[in-house]
Amino acid sequence: MARVKRGNIARKRAKKILQLAKGYRGAHSRLFRIANQQVMKALRYSYVGRKQKKRVFRKLWITRINAASRLNGLSYSRLIHNFKKSNIELNRKMLSQIAVLDIPTFNQLIAISK
């Protein structure tokens, strides 16, 4: 059986990883093994971060809605309950935008839901 030489393939692989590790400090951007570990860790963090971003934004929207609704003497949970009863189907992102950017409209929504 013929001997398989993998010089080009190994170089390509290492180059690809080092390219991804560009901008890392010290050996993390220069040495293949360490760079490989850091790239894998970074990819793991970015994957997890994409999931966490959704949670963080939802939490932010709820906080904003709660703050705006408390100015009108309602808690967040009471407000959402009233919206459900009144068939006002706005998601939390939209409600948050309205609460921050268009306060009179938000106050009207609260008045309608009461």
From Swiss-Prot:
A single Gene Ontology CC term: ribonucleoprotein complex
Keywords, in A-Z order: Chloroplast, Plastid, Ribonucleoprotein, Ribosomal protein, RNA-binding, rRNA-binding
Coiled coil: none
GO biological process: ribosomal large subunit assembly; translation
Protein known as: Large ribosomal subunit protein bL20c
Entry keyword Repressor: no
Domain of life: Eukaryota
Organism: Trieres chinensis (Marine centric diatom)
Subcellular location: Plastid, Chloroplast
GO function term, MF aspect, one: structural constituent of ribosome
Reported function: Binds directly to 23S ribosomal RNA and is necessary for the in vitro assembly process of the 50S ribosomal subunit. It is not involved in the protein synthesizing functions of that subunit.
Similarity field: Belongs to the bacterial ribosomal protein bL20 family.
InterPro entries the UniProt entry points to: Ribosomal_bL20, RIBOSOMAL_L20_CS, Ribosomal_protein_bL20_C
Main localization (coarse): plastid
